[in-house]
């Protein structure tokens, strides 16, 4: 694998977001403020994107990341739905995920470059990742105040996507054959979903106040 500082930085920030999420749930022994629906969507993203994990070896780095994303995502769902189920805020976590999944399936069949199962699933995962955070954002909007570790988790998720945009720009400038408009568009949409969140997160840090969404 060619060393790419921007991609590695993005991946490290993504891992940091997972650390914040699991630390919040395990150390506080609750999943208050965490959307189970978003976590399920992210798990679907990783499963459909990494169908080739058992037969397509690109690099040890890539394989380790795939395993980490799959296992931590499944573990997070277990913690929310089983171990700390009594603290799950199902009253506010109400977005119907099928409103996100079905359009992504349709778009995957329209925009896939190859009608193989792995390619259709990969394309589907790109679309779904762009909107998987929506249940989480809507849950936080409905409750208002955001816990510290929750805010760090979501901030890192947004930063990870922003760093990937820089990575794409870098690759486009340095690799002649690099062309991935679908990834760029979906990744940009995903990053835009975090813009308002970034604003209020940074504002609360600068002012030393609690992080509250309007």
Swiss-Prot record:
Matching InterPro entries: ER_ret_rcpt
Is Transmembrane found in the keyword set?
A: yes
What are the TM regions of this chain, as residue ranges? Answer: 5-23, 38-55, 64-82, 99-112, 120-139, 152-170, 182-202
Instruction: Give the PANTHER family listed for this entry.
Output: ER LUMEN PROTEIN RETAINING RECEPTOR (PTHR10585)
- A GO biological process this protein is involved in? protein retention in ER lumen
Phylogenetic placement of the source organism: Eukaryota, Amoebozoa, Evosea, Archamoebae, Mastigamoebida
Keywords assigned: Endoplasmic reticulum, ER-Golgi transport, Membrane, Protein transport, Receptor, Transmembrane, Transmembrane helix, Transport
Function comment: Required for the retention of luminal endoplasmic reticulum proteins. Determines the specificity of the luminal ER protein retention system. Also required for normal vesicular traffic through the Golgi.
For this record, the Gene Ontology CC terms, alphabetical, are: cis-Golgi network; endoplasmic reticulum; endoplasmic reticulum membrane
Segments on the Lumenal side according to the record's topology features: 1-4, 56-63, 113-119, 171-181
Q: Which residues lie on this side of the membrane: Cytoplasmic?
A: 24-37, 83-98, 140-151, 203-214
Q: Where in the cell is it found?
A: Endoplasmic reticulum membrane
Name assigned to this protein: ER lumen protein-retaining receptor
Q: Which GO terms describe its molecular function?
A: ER retention sequence binding
Say if the entry is tagged with keyword Protein transport: yes
Family that this chain belongs to: Belongs to the ERD2 family.
Topology with regard to the membrane?
A: Multi-pass membrane protein
Supply the source organism for this entry: Entamoeba histolytica (strain ATCC 30459 / HM-1:IMSS / ABRM)
């Amino acid at each position: 694998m060619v060393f790419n500082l921007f991609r590695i930085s993005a991946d490290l920030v993504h891992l940091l977001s997972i650390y914040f999420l699991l630390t919040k749930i395990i150390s506080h022994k609750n999943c208050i403020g965490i959307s189970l629906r978003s976590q399920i969507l992210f798990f679907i993203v990783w499963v459909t994107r990494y169908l080739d994990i058992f037969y397509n070896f690109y690099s040890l780095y890539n394989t380790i990341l795939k395993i980490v994303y799959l296992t931590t995502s499944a573990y997070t769902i277990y913690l929310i739905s089983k171990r700390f189920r009594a603290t799950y805020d199902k009253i506010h976590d109400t977005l119907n995920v099928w409103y996100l999944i079905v359009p992504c399936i349709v778009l995957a069949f329209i925009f896939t470059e190859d009608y193989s199962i792995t390619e259709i699933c990969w394309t589907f995962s790109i679309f779904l990742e762009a909107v998987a955070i929506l249940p989480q954002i809507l849950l936080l909007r409905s409750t208002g105040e955001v816990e510290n570790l929750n805010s760090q988790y979501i901030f890192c998720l947004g930063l990870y996507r922003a760093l990937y945009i820089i990575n794409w720009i870098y690759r486009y400038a340095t690799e002649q054959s690099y062309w991935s408009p679908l990834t760029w568009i979906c990744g940009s949409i995903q990053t835009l979903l975090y813009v308002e969140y970034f604003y209020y997160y940074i504002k609360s840090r600068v002012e030393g106040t609690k992080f509250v969404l309007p």
